[in-house]
Amino acid sequence: MKLIAAYLLAYLGGNSSPSAADVKDILNAVGAEANEEKLEFL
């Protein structure tokens, strides 16, 4: 769920096609760990 939330935050922030690195950066900014396996699915 946190991956989807981070993806949507990036999208709402103006990034029309957030990458896995963008999502990972958002999660790292709040101290959450990114599951690499699920992150690659995006």
Swiss-Prot record:
GO terms for molecular function: structural constituent of ribosome. One of its GO terms (cellular component) is cytosolic large ribosomal subunit. Keywords: Phosphoprotein, Ribonucleoprotein, Ribosomal protein. Signal peptide: none annotated. Disulfide bonds: none annotated. InterPro entries: P1/P2_N_sf, Ribosomal_P2. GO terms for biological process: cytoplasmic translational elongation. The keyword Iron does not apply. Belongs to the eukaryotic ribosomal protein P1/P2 family. This is Large ribosomal subunit protein P2. It comes from Triticum aestivum.
